Curated annotation (Swiss-Prot):
Keyword Zinc-finger: no
Protein name, as recorded: Uncharacterized protein RP255
GO CC term, one of those recorded: plasma membrane
Alphabetical keyword list: Cell membrane, Membrane, Transmembrane, Transmembrane helix
Transmembrane regions listed in the UniProt entry: 10-29, 75-93, 98-117, 130-147, 157-179, 199-221, 236-255, 262-284, 289-311, 323-340, 355-374
Membrane topology: Multi-pass membrane protein
Primary location: membrane
Subcellular location per the Swiss-Prot or TrEMBL entry: Cell membrane
Family annotation (SUPFAM superfamilies): MFS general substrate transporter (SSF103473)
Domain of life of the organism encoding this protein: Bacteria
Length: 381
């Protein structure tokens, strides 16, 4: 495939990521209100919000079997078709159980689409991988910021649901405007156990990053109220994070591509832990509160990208696709673990317990990461 076709494919792939980000942001801001209109109770909505992440885990295990048998394009088209059907179902369905199953299927489609789209971009971008990985995060943040600006004009009605379905249709149309060249040469001599051993640290990192992200989304407001922090509103916090990501993510990814990624990974995790330690101490100061939130958001994004770059350096073709999918699957398990932890209502009763959860996960991981770094002499890479 020519360089011109490569960039054409990447352009449409990134455009698809942007549209997809907008749709997910619309759902994020309006999902609860829309379900309340359907006369669902608060407990039912919370249960849907938790169990929907099962779809990502199911998708992860399913794609491990299919990712090297189906092209990225075919998986993307199947995912988008499923998302269109499930989105329209939101208008039709009124039964609580069916709505819950529908949201599980939506998350199945979201995970499958995002994973396949990211693999598509990685396989095409060659030596520019760090740049286009940064663009994925940049456009995801940009889509969220755009919807945040337009949110006063977006109402949780059936018309909004139809618009989301039409945006998915636009994504499908863009798939027919470029060529997909996914390779499917299976290396039957490859030992999966050896592959897993080589990505052990990346899998654990994926779990930690996604678990912490979910904890912030779920518990930060209650924690901030308890500690009387300067910033309490989650939407405002996300706006600060997305704005800084838009400006910082490309330079961050460029730096990561040039330095020892294992050392960068360890350093970012240590910075993350320090920010969580200092947040309750200095968080009553608005400027410091904003600084720590920005650092936490950018650290999580940089760690996510750093581990993808590590996997790209380690593997090729079949092994790379399997390793990346395993990484994304572990991220989905981390998200679900974070959602399950909300069964214990420490987010609303004892906000300080939010920190205990974070310290337990990040602190133990940083300790293990440091041992792993020294044990396997990763500082030499």
């Amino acid at each position: 495939m020519t360089l011109k076709n490569d960039y054409k494919t990447i352009f449409f792939s990134l455009f698809g990521i942007f549209i997809f980000s907008c749709i997910n942001a619309i759902n994020f801001y309006n999902f609860k209100i829309f379900l309340l209109i359907k006369n669902l109770g608060g407990e039912q909505i919370n249960n849907i919000n938790q169990t929907k992440f099962i779809g990502s885990i199911i998708a992860g295990f399913s794609l491990i079997q299919l990712i090297n048998k189906l092209s990225n394009k075919r998986i993307i088209l199947i995912s988008l078709s499923l998302l269109i059907i499930c989105t329209i179902n939101l208008i039709i369905l009124n039964n609580y159980t069916l709505i819950k199953i529908n949201f599980i299927l939506i998350n199945f489609g979201i995970f499958s689409y995002f994973t396949s789209r990211t693999l598509d971009i990685i396989e095409i971008s060659k030596e520019k991988k760090y740049l286009f990985l940064a663009c994925i995060i940049l456009l995801w943040a940009g889509g969220n910021l755009m919807v945040d600006l337009l949110n006063p004009f977006i109402k949780p009605t059936n018309n909004t649901i139809v618009i989301c379905a039409l945006l998915y249709c636009i994504n499908i149309l863009t798939e027919f405007l470029h060529y997909n060249h996914t390779s499917h040469k299976l290396n039957l001599n490859s030992k999966f156990s050896s592959l897993i051993k080589n990505i052990e640290l990346q899998l654990l990192t994926g779990f930690v990053v996604s678990y912490i992200t979910l904890n912030i989304l779920w518990y930060y407001e209650a924690f901030a109220l308890k500690k009387q922090l300067a910033l309490i509103n989650l939407k405002l916090i996300l706006k600060y994070i997305f704005l800084t990501i838009c400006f910082a993510i490309i330079p961050i990814c460029y730096i990561l591509s040039k330095i020892n990624k294992y050392f960068a990974n360890l350093s970012l995790n240590i910075i993350l832990l320090i920010c969580f330690i200092l947040l309750p101490i200095h968080g009553t100061n608005k400027n410091l509160n904003i600084l720590y939130i920005i650092l936490i958001g950018n650290c999580l994004g940089a760690i996510f990208i750093c581990n993808i770059l590590i996997l790209i350096d380690k593997f090729q073709d079949y092994e790379l696709r399997t390793a990346l999918l395993s990484y994304f699957s572990m991220c989905s398990i981390g998200i679900y673990a974070g959602a399950l932890s909300s069964h214990v209502p420490y987010g609303t009763i004892k906000g300080s317990d939010f920190l205990f959860s974070v310290f337990a996960v990040v602190g133990s991981f940083v300790t293990y990461h440091f041992w792993y770094f020294i044990q396997y002499k990763l500082y030499r890479f």
